[in-house]
Structures are given as structure tokens and as C-alpha cells.
Amino acid sequence: MSHVTPAYLKQYHEELMKSFNIKYKNEDTGYFTISQPEKASPDAWGCSTLDVKGASWLIDNISLQDITGADGTTITIGDGSLYTGRAKEGRFHKKLKTNGTPFLLSETDSCASLTYEEMAVMANTGNFSNEMIAFFKKAVARDMLRIGFNGKMIAENTNPEQYKNGEDINIGWHALAKTFNKGSQVISDAFALGKGGDFADVHDLADCLITSKIPEGQREEPGLVVMVGAQLAARERLKLFNMADQPLTLTAGDMLGSSVAGRFAFIPPFMPGKRLAVTTLKNLQILTLKHSQRYRAEDIPQRGVYEHGYLREEGYALGDGYLYAASDENAVTLV
């Protein structure tokens, strides 16, 4: 069954194209789309990318990178240790250290559609056009974080009903850390957290991760943060920053009032509730193959829907595997 494209949808699509600085053209068929021309030059590809910057505080503070290869190893230069001194004989010297983790990009597709009937209701509300694209950007940004914290594998056909947090879409940061250096950076053996347990509280656990797993030269890194699972924070009634998925700016005062083990701490969206991790936000990387991005906004009369889609080659990496330390959610027993 084919539907007639509503007039309000044509108006919305025209406004959307203007926001992408693309000349509007209503085809005779009534079908229209924003997508990448087949023979476009690389310089024109920007019109079909989706910029998620500004969608949330966390997405703005991690590392989003366009790269030129679909696989490889990230390289981080230096380890935060001392590189200055003197030698009685000749010049002082010290070898520069490099660290990194392997990465593999895979095809990743995001999609959100509305029926004509749903859009008719929404079109009567103010600022509908801006809200529609803002929602899709935020949805993609949230999914990028969701996969980063929960991803465990790359399935040929994903199952969102079984893996509601994208566990089968890509290999996220925590899963990468569990295989890095034979798992040295993640506590995977069973332990008890609470009074009389192996660790008295979250502060004690975070301090152990910092002092035993983060290299000595990086323990005082100003950007080091503690990410606390919601279940751990609730158990100890910690009042931590928990709006990392919102587009806002934190002040020094905000950060001072949200701390664990003397470091800024927050509750990340979608991170498993009993996990605790210490790292710098820039160490959390989302990599996209340059020129692989394809954003589309499409009217599909055959199904009576208007659809937003974003296709790209994407993957996750840790800039420095040693700069990530965590306790696995399956290892902890709360006592």
C-alpha cells in the first residue's frame, strides 16, 4: 500500500534541507530524501554526516575521531611520568613510551521513523522541526555511549530485543579492557563490597584501582575521573552528577561537589549498575572511518513513514589501555 505524502511533511523536509545548507528540490514523484549523491566528491560529504557534538555532556568530553583505516592500533604517546633530569656524564635521556589498544570498525546503522499519523499530531506542536532532528541526534549519541559501556561482540545480524544495550553491535571500552594485557586492568575475580567485605565502600575500591592499576606517573593526572554504576551510588547514597546524557556545562563547583576518592565522579548513562571504572574521558575513543558517514532523511510513501537514518563504519578503542582500571559488575557482591 502506498500513501500520499502530506503537505506538512514536505514543509518539514524543506526546512531540514535548508538547515543542512542543501537546495530544496521537490521531485515529481513526491518522494524526497537527503542522502549522499553517488558521485559526490569527498569535499561534499559533510552534507550527509550527522554531528552529535552538543547532544550531551559526556559525548562532548570523550574522544570522537575520524580515521582513515578500518582496523589498527591506537597510539598514545607518553605515560605521564617524569621526563626531566640531569646526568653527570653526558646528557640526560629517557625513552618515550607509547601505548594503545587494537580497534576494528564495523558497519553501524541507526534508524528512527515516524508514521504519517504520528507526524500529523506532532506537526501541530511548536518548534517541531528542530525537535525532530535534535531527538535523532540525541538518540544516536546515547546509543554510541550505550554500546561503548556494554558492547561485547560484533554480530552479523543484531538482536535489539535480546541485547537491549547493544551488546552485540560492537566491542565497547570495558570489553576491550578485559582483554588488554591479559586482563590486568580489570578486577574480574569475586570480591565483596561493604562493611566486613574486601573493600569497605566505593571510595576504598576506587582508591585501590588507582593505586594498584593506574601507572604511578598517571595517578595524579588532572583529568582522571571515577565512573560509578547507579546501583553502587544508590547503595551508598552518594550524591553524584548523574546528568551526563544531557547537553550542559559543568562548573568547577559542580565537579567539586561530586567526588569519590578525591577525584571527580559521576554516574554514566547505561553503564552497568555495579561496575566502577577509573580513566580519563579523552581515553574513551569512538572511531569512525572518514567519508563512511551517510545521514539520510527520507520520505517513504510505500510504508507511510518519514525516516531518519545514519550509516557509518564505527568502532571503539582505549587510547591507553593502562589508563583504564575497573571492577567488573559480575565480580562484586554487595554485603
Where are each of the predicted segments found?
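Sequence/fold signature of self-assembling virion shell proteins
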Residues: 1-48, 53, 58, 168-193, ...
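Short, conserved, surface-exposed binding loops centered on an aromatic residue
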Residues: 214-219, 257
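Alpha-helical scaffold segments that mediate packing/assembly in large oligomeric complexes
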Residues: 116-205
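Phosphate-interacting basic helix/loop segments used at nucleotide- and nucleic-acid interfaces
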Residues: 202-214
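Amphipathic interfacial helices
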Residues: 207, 217, 224-226
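A glycine-rich phosphate-binding loop feature that marks nucleotide/adenosyl-phosphate handling sites
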Residues: 153-157, 223-232
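Assembly/oligomerization interface modules of large self-assembling protein complexes
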Residues: 30-113, 166, 170-172
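Signature of extracytoplasmic/envelope-associated structural regions
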Residues: 4-7, 63-87, 142, 146-154, ...
